[in-house]
């Protein structure tokens, strides 16, 4: 939980929020194709003891991944992966881009074209610098004709000044 005790802290927090928004916008991955319909990339943004873990995914035209699937449906929803080294602690839940209702299956939510996911992390007092954050996604990509086998893609991101 983030506690803002003064206007200065609130200003610093909103400045970090703006940096996160810019980082989400600027993060790119390779162009998806029909042969490789989903591409993703990840990075971290570091400001003092606050860290934002950012994952962005792109889908080729006509392809989608699932955000929410009712238990009666056979599709596999996306799972965000976050493994933290000692001294780092996750704060809250994943912030996610807005999914869309899937016209073919009521109750199913999907991502088309792109999606992003952000998780906040804090460094514990006295924690040493460095370490590696593992993050990524487990997902199933589908188009209107087929669903590919699920894929897990993980990135190892070094926690160091300048991220």
What does each model-identified segment do?
Residues 1-7:
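Bacterial N-terminal signal peptides
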Residues 8-12:
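Sec/Tat signal peptide C-region and signal peptidase I cleavage site
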Residues 13-163:
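Extracellular/lumen-exposed scaffold segments
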């Amino acid at each position: 939980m983030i506690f803002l005790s003064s206007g200065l802290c609130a200003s610093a927090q909103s400045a970090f929020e703006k940096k996160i928004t810019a980082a989400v916008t600027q993060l790119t991955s390779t162009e998806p194709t029909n042969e490789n319909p989903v591409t993703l990339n990840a990075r971290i943004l570091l400001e003092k003891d606050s860290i934002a873990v950012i994952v962005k995914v792109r889908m080729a035209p006509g392809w989608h991944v699932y955000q929410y699937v009712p238990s009666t449906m056979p599709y596999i929803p996306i799972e965000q992966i976050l493994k933290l080294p000692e001294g780092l602690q996750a704060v809250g839940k994943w912030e996610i881009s807005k999914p869309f209702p899937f016209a073919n299956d009521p109750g199913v939510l999907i991502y088309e074209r792109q999606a992003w996911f952000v998780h906040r992390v804090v460094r514990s007092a006295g924690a040493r610098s460095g370490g590696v954050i593992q993050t990524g996604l487990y997902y199933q990509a589908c188009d209107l004709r087929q669903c590919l086998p699920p894929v897990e893609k993980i990135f190892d991101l070094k926690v160091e000044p300048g991220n």
